[in-house]
Structures are given as C-alpha cells and as structure tokens.
Swiss-Prot record:
The keyword Membrane applies. InterPro entries: PEX8-like (IPR055334). It comes from the Eukaryota. A motif (Microbody targeting signal) lies at residues 711-713. Disruption phenotype: Leads to a peroxisomal-deficient phenotype with the absence of peroxisomes and the accumulation of aberrant peroxisomal structures resembling 'membranous ghosts'. The gene is PEX8. It is found in: Peroxisome membrane. Keywords: Membrane, Peroxisome. Its main location: membrane. Induction: Induced in presence of methanol by the transcription factor MRX1 that binds the 5'-CYCC-3' consensus sequence within the PEX8 promoter. It comes from Komagataella phaffii (strain GS115 / ATCC 20864). This is Peroxisomal biogenesis factor 8.
Length: 713
C-alpha cells in the first residue's frame, strides 16, 4: 500500500544525495512519458502536501494518521526527513511561533504511543523507533544548525516513554527500545547545548518552545548539561517571565477565563491547548527548581535574579487578587483548576528559592536576603490565600514548608519586617467587601494566622494597639463588617479566638520587647471576661472540642506555676467559680438536634432510664466528648479537665463538688457514667506527674465513689 511511487523515489534519491541539507526545495518528478504512466501512491501525495502545504493543510494531523501505518523503515525515515523540511514549521528559526510549533511535540508523543500499541502488522515498534532516530541523527550530522528543529520532536518522543510503560513494561526487543531512548536523550542534550551556544535563544518564541521542551524532558536531562546551559543563559528570569507575563502563560493575570463568568470546561481545555506555558505550569516550576539548585555561578548574581523574580511574582499576585472577588462553586468552569495550578507552581518555585539558603554556607547572605525573600513570599501567599482557603493544603507539604520557613526567616532575622507585614496586610484588606468577597475574607484569615504566630513575641505597640483590639472586636461580634451569625465568617471567628488564646501566653514570654508587668496586668483583666464569652458562645459558635481547648489554655495561664497565679491567686478561684456556676445554671439543652424518631428526652429517674435502656438492648457507653448530648455535660467535662492544675489544698474539695453537685445530679445515665469515668481519668492522670496530689485523689475516690459504683481499686 505504501511503496514509493515516482515522486517518492525521486525525493528519496535527493535526500540520499545530500540535497536535504541544501537551501533548495526538493523537486517532485514525474514529467516524462514513462514516469507519467506510473500511478502516484498515497505517501507521494502526503510528501507533496508536506513540501508545499496550503494554508489549511493539517500537516500534524496527516503525520499522526499515517506514521503508525507505514510498512517499512525506509518510508518512516523518508517521512521524518521530509517533515524536517516542512516550511510550516521549520522554514527559519527567526519566524518560529510557539503556538504553531508546540503541536509538533504533542504529535510525536501521540505518534510514538500509538505506534507502540499497534506495532503489528506494520513495522515493529523497535524498528520504527530506530528509523525515526536514524533520520534525526542524520539531520544532526548533515547540518548541526538544524538542532532547533529536532528539540520538539525529541521531546515528544521522550514524553511517550511513560505512555509506553503504562501499556507494557517489558515489550519485545526492550533492550533495543531502551537503547533508542538513551540515544534520543543524548541527542536532545546535544541539541539544547548547541541551541544556547549558537545564540538562537534571542528568538522569544523559539526560546519559549525550548524552555517548555526542556521542562517536559527534564527527567532525561543530566545535571552537567543544565550547568553548561546556565553558563550561557539566565533561566531564572526566563522561566518566571514565561509563566507569569508571557501571552503563553498567565499573561499578567489578563486571562478571560478569570473574569468571564460564562466560560466552561471546554474553554479551559482550549485555553491550555492554546497556551503551552499554562499547560505545563508544574513542569516549568520544577525546571525552575532544578536550575536554581544547579546554578553554581555568582551567589550574589543568583540571589539578585531571584529577588527580581519575586518582585514580578508579587506584582502578579496583587493583580490576580484584585481581578477575582468571587469564586464560582461550579468546578466545571475551570477557574478553580487554573488557580490551583497557579498556586502549586508558585509554591514549588518558592520552595526552590528557600532551599537555596539551606545549601548556602554564608551567614551574611542568609541574614541579608532571607528576611527580604520571606517578606515577598508571604506577601504573595497573602494575595493567593483565597486559593488555599478554597482547596486546602492536605497532602501538599511544600506549602507548609514555605510558610513556616518564611515565618522563621523574618522572626529570627528581622522582627520589624514581621510587624510591618501585619500592619500592611491589615490595611490591605477591603473590610467593606468581606461579606461578598472570598478573596477579602481569605486575606483577613491569612493575617489572623500571621498574628497568631507573632502576638506573644512582637512589640507591645503592635500587640496592644492593633492585634488585641482587632481580634476582640471579632470574637465579640463588634466589627461592623463581620457577623459571626453568617457561616462565611466561621473560620475568621475561630482564628480570632486562636489569636486571643495565643496572646494569653505572652506572660510566659522572655522576649526583650515585651513589657512583662504591662502584659500580666492586661491578661489578668481580660481572662475572666473571655472565659465567660467562650462559655456563652458554646455551642452556637464554638464546638465542644474548641471549648475544651480554650478552657484548658486559660487554666494553664491562671493556675500555679504561671505568672498570673503569682500576680493574683484569686484569679484561679474566680476561674473555677465561673465555670462551676455555669455548670449549675446552664440548661440541659441538647448539643445536636436529633431526628424526631431518635429524640432523647432526659428521663426523670433511673427507673425510666433502665426501661429506655432495656428497650435498646442496654445503655450505650459514650466513647468521647463528641458523644455528649447536652451542653451541661460538656461544661462539666471541661471543668473536670482542669482539676490536675488545682492547688493541693483545694484538690479534694473540687473533686467532691464535681462528683456530688454535678455528676450525681446528671439525669442522663450514659452521660453520668461518662463524666464519672472522666473524673477517674483525671485522678489517675494527676497521680502520674504529682504523686502527692494523686494519692489524695485516689484516697478520696476510694472513700467517696467506690462505695457507690463499681470499684476501681
């Protein structure tokens, strides 16, 4: 079917005679009488289309269709040789278009993968592969200046390796195939070096094509090759420009998909197909990581390049956060997918930048550059946090590494920068749009998280004049722009509580810029009103676990061995009395509204309890705090949790109060059993670290509880 006709043989003859490397176009023969009597074959027509394509000729489509069907190696080599002379793609390096030439890479990935699946009955795959490789090697040999033509083809071939492995790991003639893989990788590296040594990188589109090709074939490019390339070309800036500012990438956030609510998933796929840098954001970020790691040039110069790159990324993030105010919940519209890729790429780049400081053996550079880089990266995360808030960071450890490293960098080397960031972020939030803007809420949440990290070590001015007033307004629902009854503010409300709890630990701080007496006095004044607030907001706004954490944190601040206890011992007594009185007076309301058929009504006596339990096969034992059904029981449990901290002189008194006044009076049988068990756990836990107090508790239990229930001892 695919034996050469007259035109094909003429072309093959010209190629074999070396005409393929000349500037003259190949001549199609067939004017003589004898030649005219021969019928051209399909391959002849294909070659004619390739050498003189019309504007609407889909050369790539023809290749993808015909390549796997060729029946002998000579035709495979001929088609490859001929394609390398196609004026649509390879007329001159100065007129290369990325959008036009990138499909070559995808085509050869498809061709090689498809051919591997249908190796028979046409040319076996290993021979097909060898023929393609031989043609590419011949092109390199006859004219080394054609290196730029080979790069996308070689990249496509290498991309197909994973697709082949997915089909069959150990095909026939695997040794020959592996040998061809190695030869292709070596040829690609030679072409990359020649490209950057020749000065062809001056062509923007061609250089972009090569950068994308290198990112796609990164697993097959050796470190030594990358180092040699870095001597010739500044990859750091080029990759950042390609990702964030080129029309083939994020285009300085000027992408219709980000502002047009009518787009759909088809538009997203089309966007990726038309913009190769967008399609390979992650690969480009890993290329950046590799080049930063291997760049052994001037440290000062490298860090300056990184600094410039971060400036560009920060500018992009600011524009992006202004462009997007609301994310559509319809995930099919592609905006979320694009933003997720943008975030991941940014984090990988930041991780690469920060990792360089762990490799530097120069404290001066670290001290000078790390705080500056950390400030810029945190500013970028501040602008992009709406993406993190939407998708979370579960399983994406690089984000945590970047965030915590930046925090440590500014706290350790430049605390003033950390404080400046808090002020900048706080003033950079559009509070009036918090209700409607997911981006604005995410910025506030990010700022609160940062406040939590530094509130107990920052200056008194920042803490007392900005942070504490802001979070107090939030938790007390006094901020006009935040309504805690609106579920969209739930995470902000909870984060504000976390900042206050962290603020209470300032009394344990030994930082020089903390006025000890001022802060101890302030905490002493605020801690009991805050305890009352927490109790009142449970369970409508705070969960049972959040209540437990808050009360445990407060108790450690007011009981013995704490500065507050040394300052005023009465505060611990007030703490216990407030919590106990709430346990006495609070309604026995259910924490969760159960379906009508499963509603639990607190029975009036044990006899009714036993009847109910018997109908259900016996009482169901509660396993955790979350099993508690009433607000009263949850508060009693929280009170019991602080008993290990109570002074020795008051310890048994409070055990008796909890048991007789609260636990015994609990109407629901299973909850009563749970609270009694929790009290016992408290006694045993106390004994582990304070035997004197623990012994008192055990003796108390033996005398008071064992006589009324199953003996623990």
């Amino acid at each position: 079917m695919y034996r050469l006709g007259s035109q094909g043989r003429s072309i093959q003859s010209q190629l074999q005679n070396g005409d393929s490397s000349s500037g003259r176009p190949l001549q199609l023969q067939g004017t003589g009488m004898r030649e005219a009597q021969r019928i051209p074959q399909q391959l002849d027509y294909l070659l004619a289309e390739i050498i003189s394509p019309n504007e609407d000729t889909n050369v790539i489509g023809y290749l993808a269709y015909y390549y796997p069907k060729l029946k002998n190696e000579q035709n495979v080599a001929l088609l490859t040789d001929f394609f390398l002379r196609c004026p649509t793609y390879f007329s001159h390096s100065n007129v290369v278009s990325l959008r036009n030439n990138y499909p070559v890479m995808e085509a050869f990935n498809y061709i090689m993968t498809t051919k591997f699946k249908v190796s028979q009955p046409t040319v076996p795959f290993y021979r097909f592969y060898a023929a393609v490789l031989a043609s590419l090697l011949n092109c390199e040999k006859t004219d080394p200046s054609h290196h730029w033509k080979l790069i996308p083809i070689l990249t496509g071939v290498l991309l197909s390796i994973k697709g082949r492995d997915d089909v069959e790991l150990y095909p026939d003639h695997s040794r020959s195939i592996k040998g061809s893989d190695t030869a292709v990788a070596q040829l690609l590296q030679r072409c990359l070096l020649r490209f950057y040594q020749s000065g062809d990188a001056r062509s923007y589109d061609l250089n972009a094509l090569v950068i994308i090709s290198m990112s796609c074939a990164l697993d097959y490019v050796e470190d030594d090759t990358i180092k040699k390339i870095l001597y010739c070309f500044n990859y750091t800036r080029a990759i950042i420009d390609l990702i964030y500012y080129s029309p083939y990438g994020l285009n300085d956030s000027d992408i219709p998909l980000l502002s047009d609510s009518s787009v759909n998933s088809q538009s997203f796929d089309q966007l990726l197909n038309n913009n190769p840098a967008l399609k390979h954001l992650n690969r480009l970020s890993f290329l950046f990581e590799r080049t930063v790691k291997l760049n052994d040039g001037s440290i000062q110069s490298n860090l300056n390049d990184i600094d410039i790159s971060l400036n560009k990324m920060q500018s992009f993030s600011e524009k992006l956060s202004k462009k997007i105010s609301v994310l559509d919940d319809d995930s099919s519209k592609g905006v979320g997918q694009l933003l997720r890729q943008c975030l991941y790429a940014s984090i990988i780049i930041h991780q690469a930048i920060l990792t360089t400081f762990f490799q530097l053996d120069n404290a001066d550079y670290t001290k000078y550059f790390l705080p500056s880089f950390s400030r810029k990266i945190l500013s970028i995360l501040f602008n992009l946090f709406f993406i993190v808030d939407r998708i979370g960071t579960g399983g994406f450890q690089p984000y945590n590494f970047v965030y915590l490293t930046c925090l440590q960098g500014i706290i350790q080397y430049d605390m003033k920068t950390a404080e400046s960031l808090v002020k900048t972020f706080t003033t950079g939030i559009n509070y009036s749009s918090l209700k409607d803007s997911e981006v604005a809420r995410a910025k506030l949440l990010f700022t609160l998280n940062l406040m939590e990290q530094i509130v107990n070590i920052c200056s008194d001015d920042l803490r007392l004049e900005l942070i504490v007033p802001l979070v107090e307004d939030l938790v007390n629902n006094k901020n006009a722009c935040v309504d805690i009854h609106n579920h969209v503010f739930k995470s902000i409300f909870e984060s504000a509580h976390s900042v206050i709890l962290k603020f209470f630990t300032v009394v344990d701080s030994s930082v020089k810029n903390v006025d000890y007496e001022t802060n101890v006095t302030l905490v002493s004044e605020k801690i009991i009103p805050y305890l009352t607030l927490v109790i009142d907001q449970f369970p409508e706004f705070l969960s049972i676990n959040q209540l437990d954490i808050a009360i445990e944190t407060i108790s450690r601040t007011v009981f013995p061995d704490s500065p507050i206890y040394s300052y005023d011992k009465n505060i611990s007594s007030m703490f216990l009395n407030v919590l106990f009185n709430k346990c006495l007076t609070v309604d026995n309301d259910e924490l969760v509204e159960l379906p009508a058929i499963e509603a639990v009504v607190a029975p009036k006596n044990d006899e009714e309890n036993n009847t109910s339990d018997a109908q259900d096969g016996g009482p169901k034992e509660l396993q955790s705090l979350n099993d508690l059904k009433s607000r009263r029981s949850a508060l009693i449990s929280a009170l019991i949790s602080v008993f290990p901290l109570i002074p020795v002189k008051d310890y048994t008194k409070w055990l008796s109060i909890a048991f007789y006044d609260l636990i015994v009076a609990t109407p629901e049988r299973t909850e009563r059993a749970f609270l009694q068990e929790r009290l016992w756990d408290c006694v045993v836990g106390t004994n582990k670290y304070d035997p004197q107090k623990g012994n008192l508790g055990i003796m108390w239990w033996y005398e008071n509880v064992n006589a009324q229930s199953t003996a623990k001892l």
